[in-house]
């Protein structure tokens, strides 16, 4: 599967999560939602932001299962992937809010 097809399929699986975009960067694709970066696609791998402020690779077995043809997809695999992505996005969003709130607080001192 070529990179464009892979990214397209990942975005299709993420379609229940509105406003997810993929933007090409140096050597990888960056995943954003509402202007917040929460993931990366490098070659055929999806990496999501973790609690440790690092991008952790989603299990290759799960990625392989969500890339199956539609008539062979198990909805629980799509749901598991969406859960991981949503968790990563909320984590990234909370970090941005914390940084901006702290900056705003410091500017008002």
Placement of each model-derived feature along the sequence:
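Charge-dense, helix-prone N-terminal extensions
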Residues: 1-109
């Amino acid at each position: 599967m070529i990179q464009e097809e892979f990214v397209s399929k990942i975005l299709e699986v993420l379609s229940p999560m509105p406003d997810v975009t993929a933007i090409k960067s140096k050597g990888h694709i960056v995943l954003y939602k509402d202007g917040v970066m929460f993931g990366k696609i490098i070659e055929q791998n999806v990496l999501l932001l973790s609690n440790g402020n690092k991008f952790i690779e989603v299990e290759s077995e799960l990625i392989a299962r969500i890339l199956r043809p539609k008539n062979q997809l198990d909805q629980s695999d799509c749901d598991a992937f969406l859960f991981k992505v949503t968790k990563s996005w909320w984590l990234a969003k909370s970090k941005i809010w914390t940084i901006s709130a702290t900056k705003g607080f410091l500017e008002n001192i």
